[in-house]
Protein backbone atom coordinates (compact mmCIF):
# COMPACT_ATOMS: atom_id res chain seq x y z
CA UNK A 1 0.00 0.00 0.00
CA UNK A 2 2.83 2.38 0.87
CA UNK A 3 4.67 1.52 -2.36
CA UNK A 4 1.57 2.22 -4.42
CA UNK A 5 1.14 5.56 -2.67
CA UNK A 6 4.76 6.49 -3.32
CA UNK A 7 4.51 5.59 -7.00
CA UNK A 8 1.28 7.56 -7.38
CA UNK A 9 2.82 10.60 -5.66
CA UNK A 10 5.90 10.38 -7.86
CA UNK A 11 3.68 10.38 -10.93
CA UNK A 12 1.91 13.50 -9.72
CA UNK A 13 5.21 15.20 -8.93
CA UNK A 14 6.46 14.49 -12.44
CA UNK A 15 3.52 16.43 -13.85
CA UNK A 16 4.00 19.52 -11.69
CA UNK A 17 6.53 21.11 -13.98
CA UNK A 18 7.69 19.48 -17.17
CA UNK A 19 10.04 22.25 -18.25
CA UNK A 20 13.43 22.85 -16.61
CA UNK A 21 13.57 25.98 -14.49
CA UNK A 22 15.10 29.02 -16.19
CA UNK A 23 15.82 32.06 -14.09
CA UNK A 24 15.82 35.50 -15.69
CA UNK A 25 18.60 36.74 -13.46
CA UNK A 26 22.15 35.67 -12.78
CA UNK A 27 23.85 35.35 -9.42
CA UNK A 28 25.45 38.69 -8.58
CA UNK A 29 25.46 38.73 -4.77
CA UNK A 30 25.44 35.14 -3.48
CA UNK A 31 24.61 34.52 0.19
CA UNK A 32 27.64 33.07 1.97
CA UNK A 33 26.98 29.82 3.81
CA UNK A 34 28.88 29.42 7.08
CA UNK A 35 29.47 26.65 9.58
CA UNK A 36 27.03 26.85 12.50
CA UNK A 37 29.63 27.89 15.06
CA UNK A 38 30.72 30.78 12.83
CA UNK A 39 27.34 32.45 13.34
CA UNK A 40 26.78 35.00 16.09
CA UNK A 41 24.18 34.33 18.77
CA UNK A 42 21.80 36.73 16.99
CA UNK A 43 22.35 35.00 13.64
CA UNK A 44 21.66 31.61 15.19
CA UNK A 45 18.48 32.90 16.78
CA UNK A 46 17.34 34.41 13.48
CA UNK A 47 17.85 31.13 11.67
CA UNK A 48 15.96 29.06 14.23
CA UNK A 49 13.14 31.64 14.28
CA UNK A 50 12.87 31.33 10.50
CA UNK A 51 12.60 27.53 10.75
CA UNK A 52 9.85 27.95 13.34
CA UNK A 53 8.19 30.49 11.04
CA UNK A 54 7.83 27.85 8.31
CA UNK A 55 5.70 25.80 10.68
CA UNK A 56 3.20 28.69 10.91
CA UNK A 57 2.68 29.07 7.14
CA UNK A 58 0.09 27.21 5.10
CA UNK A 59 1.37 24.31 2.97
CA UNK A 60 1.68 24.73 -0.79
CA UNK A 61 2.74 21.29 -1.99
CA UNK A 62 -0.72 19.76 -2.09
CA UNK A 63 0.70 16.55 -0.66
CA UNK A 64 -1.11 14.42 1.89
CA UNK A 65 -0.04 14.84 5.51
CA UNK A 66 1.12 18.44 5.28
CA UNK A 67 -0.12 21.09 7.68
CA UNK A 68 2.49 23.79 7.04
CA UNK A 69 5.42 24.80 4.84
CA UNK A 70 7.96 22.85 6.88
CA UNK A 71 5.90 19.72 6.24
CA UNK A 72 5.99 20.39 2.50
CA UNK A 73 9.71 19.70 2.36
CA UNK A 74 9.48 16.54 4.44
CA UNK A 75 6.65 15.24 2.26
CA UNK A 76 8.44 15.86 -1.04
CA UNK A 77 11.57 14.09 0.20
CA UNK A 78 9.52 11.21 1.58
CA UNK A 79 7.61 10.69 -1.65
CA UNK A 80 10.73 10.80 -3.81
CA UNK A 81 12.98 8.74 -1.52
CA UNK A 82 12.88 5.57 -3.66
CA UNK A 83 14.41 7.40 -6.63
CA UNK A 84 16.91 9.87 -5.10
CA UNK A 85 19.35 7.69 -3.15
CA UNK A 86 22.23 5.60 -4.55
CA UNK A 87 21.78 7.33 -7.89
CA UNK A 88 23.93 9.72 -9.88
CA UNK A 89 21.68 12.67 -9.07
CA UNK A 90 21.66 12.10 -5.29
CA UNK A 91 24.00 14.97 -4.40
CA UNK A 92 22.50 17.45 -6.86
CA UNK A 93 18.89 16.58 -6.00
CA UNK A 94 19.68 17.31 -2.37
CA UNK A 95 21.63 20.44 -3.34
CA UNK A 96 18.51 21.80 -5.02
CA UNK A 97 16.28 20.65 -2.17
CA UNK A 98 18.35 22.45 0.49
CA UNK A 99 18.65 25.56 -1.69
CA UNK A 100 14.86 25.65 -2.07
CA UNK A 101 14.47 25.37 1.69
CA UNK A 102 16.97 28.21 2.11
CA UNK A 103 14.98 30.29 -0.39
CA UNK A 104 11.76 29.71 1.56
CA UNK A 105 13.43 30.78 4.79
CA UNK A 106 14.61 33.98 3.14
CA UNK A 107 11.62 34.89 0.99
CA UNK A 108 8.74 33.62 3.12
CA UNK A 109 10.09 34.12 6.63
CA UNK A 110 12.38 37.13 6.24
CA UNK A 111 15.60 35.31 7.08
CA UNK A 112 18.53 37.51 6.05
CA UNK A 113 21.34 34.97 6.28
CA UNK A 114 22.39 31.95 4.26
CA UNK A 115 21.77 28.28 5.00
CA UNK A 116 24.36 27.24 7.62
CA UNK A 117 26.08 23.88 7.59
CA UNK A 118 27.25 21.49 10.31
CA UNK A 119 30.85 20.35 9.87
CA UNK A 120 30.72 17.27 12.07
CA UNK A 121 34.31 16.34 11.18
CA UNK A 122 35.57 19.17 13.39
CA UNK A 123 34.40 17.26 16.46
CA UNK A 124 34.67 13.59 15.45
CA UNK A 125 36.87 11.65 17.86
CA UNK A 126 39.15 8.66 17.31
CA UNK A 127 37.65 7.40 20.57
CA UNK A 128 34.49 5.97 19.06
CA UNK A 129 32.67 5.88 22.40
CA UNK A 130 33.26 9.59 23.03
CA UNK A 131 30.14 11.71 23.40
CA UNK A 132 31.99 15.03 23.05
CA UNK A 133 30.62 15.53 19.53
CA UNK A 134 27.12 15.75 21.02
CA UNK A 135 28.19 18.44 23.48
CA UNK A 136 29.05 21.00 20.81
CA UNK A 137 27.32 24.27 19.93
CA UNK A 138 24.88 22.81 17.45
CA UNK A 139 23.18 20.80 20.20
CA UNK A 140 23.09 23.69 22.67
CA UNK A 141 19.63 23.95 24.29
CA UNK A 142 19.62 27.75 24.16
CA UNK A 143 21.45 28.72 20.96
CA UNK A 144 21.31 25.45 19.02
CA UNK A 145 18.93 22.67 18.07
CA UNK A 146 18.63 20.90 21.41
CA UNK A 147 19.96 17.49 22.29
CA UNK A 148 19.06 13.84 22.47
CA UNK A 149 15.69 12.20 22.79
CA UNK A 150 14.46 10.46 25.91
CA UNK A 151 15.61 6.87 26.35
CA UNK A 152 13.38 4.30 24.68
CA UNK A 153 14.13 0.61 24.98
CA UNK A 154 13.96 -1.34 21.73
CA UNK A 155 11.88 -4.47 22.32
CA UNK A 156 10.84 -5.30 18.76
CA UNK A 157 13.68 -6.36 16.42
CA UNK A 158 11.66 -4.98 13.51
CA UNK A 159 12.33 -1.49 14.89
CA UNK A 160 16.07 -2.06 14.42
CA UNK A 161 16.44 -3.63 10.96
CA UNK A 162 20.19 -2.94 10.78
CA UNK A 163 20.81 -4.40 14.27
CA UNK A 164 22.58 -1.21 15.33
CA UNK A 165 24.17 -1.15 18.76
CA UNK A 166 24.84 1.73 21.13
CA UNK A 167 21.67 3.75 20.77
CA UNK A 168 21.19 6.21 23.64
CA UNK A 169 17.79 7.85 23.11
CA UNK A 170 14.97 7.33 20.66
CA UNK A 171 12.21 9.40 22.21
CA UNK A 172 11.10 13.02 21.92
CA UNK A 173 13.80 15.68 22.02
CA UNK A 174 14.00 16.97 25.59
CA UNK A 175 15.75 20.34 25.24
CA UNK A 176 15.96 23.27 22.85
CA UNK A 177 13.57 24.98 20.44
CA UNK A 178 12.07 21.78 18.97
CA UNK A 179 10.63 20.04 22.02
CA UNK A 180 7.08 18.63 21.72
CA UNK A 181 5.45 21.72 23.19
CA UNK A 182 7.07 23.92 20.51
CA UNK A 183 7.35 21.73 17.43
CA UNK A 184 5.28 18.94 15.89
CA UNK A 185 5.55 16.94 12.69
CA UNK A 186 2.52 15.94 10.64
CA UNK A 187 3.62 13.90 7.66
CA UNK A 188 3.38 10.10 7.80
CA UNK A 189 1.86 9.93 11.25
CA UNK A 190 3.67 12.97 12.58
CA UNK A 191 4.32 13.49 16.26
CA UNK A 192 7.31 14.84 18.10
CA UNK A 193 10.84 15.25 16.81
CA UNK A 194 12.93 12.28 17.98
CA UNK A 195 16.70 11.82 18.27
CA UNK A 196 18.75 8.79 19.13
CA UNK A 197 22.47 9.53 19.43
CA UNK A 198 24.88 6.69 18.58
CA UNK A 199 28.45 7.81 19.39
CA UNK A 200 30.38 5.17 17.45
CA UNK A 201 28.55 5.97 14.22
CA UNK A 202 28.87 9.72 14.64
CA UNK A 203 32.59 9.56 15.35
CA UNK A 204 33.58 7.02 12.71
CA UNK A 205 31.33 8.14 9.86
CA UNK A 206 32.20 11.83 10.38
CA UNK A 207 35.98 11.34 10.39
CA UNK A 208 37.94 13.91 8.39
CA UNK A 209 39.95 11.09 6.82
CA UNK A 210 36.74 9.78 5.28
CA UNK A 211 35.88 13.23 3.93
CA UNK A 212 39.39 13.44 2.47
CA UNK A 213 38.88 10.10 0.73
CA UNK A 214 35.60 11.24 -0.80
CA UNK A 215 37.18 14.48 -2.00
CA UNK A 216 40.12 12.60 -3.53
CA UNK A 217 37.91 10.90 -6.11
CA UNK A 218 38.99 11.70 -9.68
CA UNK A 219 35.58 12.20 -11.29
CA UNK A 220 31.94 12.87 -10.47
CA UNK A 221 30.84 9.26 -10.84
CA UNK A 222 33.34 7.97 -8.29
CA UNK A 223 32.71 10.98 -6.01
CA UNK A 224 28.97 10.35 -5.98
CA UNK A 225 29.43 6.67 -5.22
CA UNK A 226 31.94 7.36 -2.44
CA UNK A 227 29.61 9.93 -0.89
CA UNK A 228 26.92 7.32 -0.22
CA UNK A 229 29.09 4.19 -0.30
CA UNK A 230 27.00 1.08 0.48
CA UNK A 231 23.62 0.82 2.26
CA UNK A 232 24.79 -0.99 5.37
CA UNK A 233 27.12 -0.40 8.30
CA UNK A 234 30.02 -2.68 7.41
CA UNK A 235 31.75 0.34 5.86
CA UNK A 236 31.40 3.98 7.00
CA UNK A 237 29.99 6.70 4.77
CA UNK A 238 29.77 10.40 5.43
CA UNK A 239 26.15 10.61 4.31
CA UNK A 240 25.22 8.31 7.18
CA UNK A 241 27.12 10.31 9.79
CA UNK A 242 24.49 12.85 10.75
CA UNK A 243 21.58 10.63 9.78
CA UNK A 244 22.46 7.68 11.98
CA UNK A 245 24.86 9.37 14.38
CA UNK A 246 22.14 11.77 15.56
CA UNK A 247 19.08 9.89 14.31
CA UNK A 248 20.20 6.45 15.35
CA UNK A 249 17.68 3.64 15.37
CA UNK A 250 14.50 5.46 16.38
CA UNK A 251 15.22 9.11 15.65
CA UNK A 252 13.64 11.20 12.90
CA UNK A 253 16.95 11.92 11.18
CA UNK A 254 17.62 8.18 10.88
CA UNK A 255 14.40 7.56 8.97
CA UNK A 256 15.34 7.50 5.29
CA UNK A 257 11.94 8.77 4.16
CA UNK A 258 11.11 11.28 6.90
CA UNK A 259 14.57 12.60 7.86
CA UNK A 260 13.88 16.24 6.81
CA UNK A 261 11.53 16.36 9.79
CA UNK A 262 14.60 17.12 11.90
CA UNK A 263 15.77 20.68 11.18
CA UNK A 264 19.33 19.37 11.51
CA UNK A 265 18.79 17.62 8.17
CA UNK A 266 19.43 20.86 6.31
CA UNK A 267 22.69 21.58 8.13
CA UNK A 268 23.84 17.99 7.64
CA UNK A 269 23.10 18.06 3.92
CA UNK A 270 24.47 21.57 3.76
CA UNK A 271 27.78 20.10 4.87
CA UNK A 272 27.59 17.32 2.28
CA UNK A 273 26.98 20.03 -0.31
CA UNK A 274 29.98 21.99 0.98
CA UNK A 275 32.08 18.85 0.49
CA UNK A 276 30.80 18.59 -3.08
CA UNK A 277 31.41 22.31 -3.65
CA UNK A 278 35.00 22.03 -2.38
CA UNK A 279 35.59 18.99 -4.58
CA UNK A 280 34.36 20.97 -7.57
CA UNK A 281 36.74 23.84 -6.79
CA UNK A 282 39.70 21.49 -7.31
CA UNK A 283 38.99 21.55 -11.07
CA UNK A 284 36.06 23.89 -11.56
CA UNK A 285 36.15 24.21 -15.39
CA UNK A 286 35.77 20.44 -15.67
CA UNK A 287 33.52 19.81 -12.70
CA UNK A 288 30.93 22.39 -13.69
CA UNK A 289 30.12 20.12 -16.62
CA UNK A 290 30.62 16.58 -15.33
CA UNK A 291 28.08 14.13 -13.94
CA UNK A 292 27.64 10.37 -13.86
CA UNK A 293 26.14 7.50 -11.96
CA UNK A 294 22.99 5.45 -12.35
CA UNK A 295 19.50 6.76 -13.03
CA UNK A 296 18.00 3.84 -11.12
CA UNK A 297 19.25 3.02 -7.59
CA UNK A 298 22.24 0.63 -7.60
CA UNK A 299 21.97 0.07 -11.36
CA UNK A 300 25.68 0.63 -11.92
CA UNK A 301 25.69 -1.24 -15.23
CA UNK A 302 22.60 0.54 -16.55
CA UNK A 303 21.87 4.00 -17.91
CA UNK A 304 23.73 6.93 -16.38
CA UNK A 305 22.53 10.44 -15.70
CA UNK A 306 23.65 13.12 -18.13
CA UNK A 307 23.98 16.89 -17.94
CA UNK A 308 20.46 17.36 -19.29
CA UNK A 309 18.91 14.94 -16.78
CA UNK A 310 16.04 16.77 -15.07
CA UNK A 311 15.64 17.06 -11.31
CA UNK A 312 12.08 17.43 -10.07
CA UNK A 313 11.34 18.56 -6.51
CA UNK A 314 7.63 18.92 -7.02
CA UNK A 315 5.93 22.16 -6.04
CA UNK A 316 8.98 23.35 -4.09
CA UNK A 317 10.58 24.80 -7.22
CA UNK A 318 10.67 24.44 -10.99
CA UNK A 319 12.55 21.61 -12.64
CA UNK A 320 16.28 22.01 -13.23
CA UNK A 321 18.93 20.10 -15.15
CA UNK A 322 21.97 18.60 -13.49
CA UNK A 323 24.17 21.00 -15.45
CA UNK A 324 22.31 23.94 -13.93
CA UNK A 325 22.65 22.45 -10.46
CA UNK A 326 26.39 21.94 -10.78
CA UNK A 327 26.78 25.73 -10.68
CA UNK A 328 26.00 27.42 -7.34
CA UNK A 329 26.57 30.82 -8.99
CA UNK A 330 24.39 30.38 -12.04
CA UNK A 331 20.88 30.99 -13.32
CA UNK A 332 19.14 28.63 -10.86
CA UNK A 333 21.29 28.53 -7.73
CA UNK A 334 22.94 31.48 -6.02
CA UNK A 335 25.13 30.91 -2.97
CA UNK A 336 28.72 30.22 -1.98
CA UNK A 337 30.64 28.93 1.04
CA UNK A 338 32.90 30.52 3.62
CA UNK A 339 35.17 27.66 4.59
CA UNK A 340 37.51 29.66 6.81
Indicate where each model-derived feature is located.
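Fungal secretory targeting signals
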Residues: 1-23
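Intrinsically disordered, flexible peripheral segments
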Residues: 19-340
